[in-house]
Amino acid sequence: MSGVFTRLVGQSAVESELVGAAWAARGDSPHGTAGTGSMTHAWLITGPPGSGRSVAALCFAAALQCTSESTPGCGQCRACTTAMAGTHADIRRVIPEGLSIGVDEMRDLVAAASRRPSTGRWQIVIIEDADRLTEGGANVLLKVVEEPPASTVFLLCAPSVDPEDIAITLRSRCRHVALLTPSADDIAQVLMERDGLAEAEARWAAAVSGGHVGRARRLATDPEARA
């Protein structure tokens, strides 16, 4: 993996799919000269806990906004760096503070997301824990997803496509990307290369983490987490 997608662990197929979509979107941006109308405006990214759903969404958002002429998601341009830092003006992240995401919050979000991008190619909305959408909140989102603004892309993150996690009608309007549970080898490699851990320690943490990257990192670096 390269660029922003180095943040993902053990998801090479997902990287290929998202990079390919970002390449295609460059010719489809409303601010480009050769739009084809083929851009999917709603995506559903699913995967088990610790697989990197929100990370994948953020990497994809960066790739869509990337201004480099090389592979989208270069990780070096201002669009990529601000996207990954959470400061890009045209990327909004919805992280639930409570147990649910209701109607009022979604209405405010949809209104803001309907504006034209100020600096980027797209106005992107990342809804982490989309499984917390209330029925009313999901209906508000469904209406805009059915007839999306030309410059807006919604990235939804949920554990699965099960109706308990995402409304069937909303799921049917989204392009689905499924993350896998990272292998112990992939997790150990990241702990060694990115966190500088010794091989034995990294492999132990990866083996007992249950495929959860964050848990493996805590087990390897925080003595209290092992108690």
Where are the language model's segments positioned?
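Conserved D-loop-proximal element of ABC-family nucleotide-binding domains
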Residues: 103, 134-136, 164, 168
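Structural recognition of the conserved hydrophobic beta-strand(s) that form the central parallel beta-sheet
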Residues: 125-128, 141, 152-159
